[in-house]
Amino acid sequence: MALTQEQKMEIISKYQLHEKDTGSPEVQIAILTERINQLTEHLKVHKKDFHSRRGLLKMVGQRRSLLNYLKRKDFERYRAIVEKLGLRK
């Protein structure tokens, strides 16, 4: 269910801005997106798992906050991460 260490390292290496970057907004958004996708699949099977649904809503809110921050600070980076992750239609 949760991200394995290997999956997390793969996401970090894909979205990091420099070699030691693990906490930039892009990396955090990418990790949250992967966790959200996994939890969404879980909830499709387990429709009555309301505790996990609450966690999902919390993660979506956190990702929204990070995206708003990035949009305010650097719009080009925001557009790049949204396009790369396919978040907007």
UniProtKB/Swiss-Prot annotation:
InterPro entries: Ribosomal_uS15, Ribosomal_uS15_bac-type, uS15_NS1_RNA-bd_sf. One of its GO terms (biological process) is translation. The keyword Cell inner membrane does not apply. Pfam families: Ribosomal_S15 (PF00312). HAMAP family: Ribosomal_uS15_B. PANTHER family: RIBOSOMAL PROTEIN S15, BACTERIAL AND ORGANELLAR, SMALL RIBOSOMAL SUBUNIT PROTEIN US15M. This is Small ribosomal subunit protein uS15. It comes from Carboxydothermus hydrogenoformans (strain ATCC BAA-161 / DSM 6008 / Z-2901).
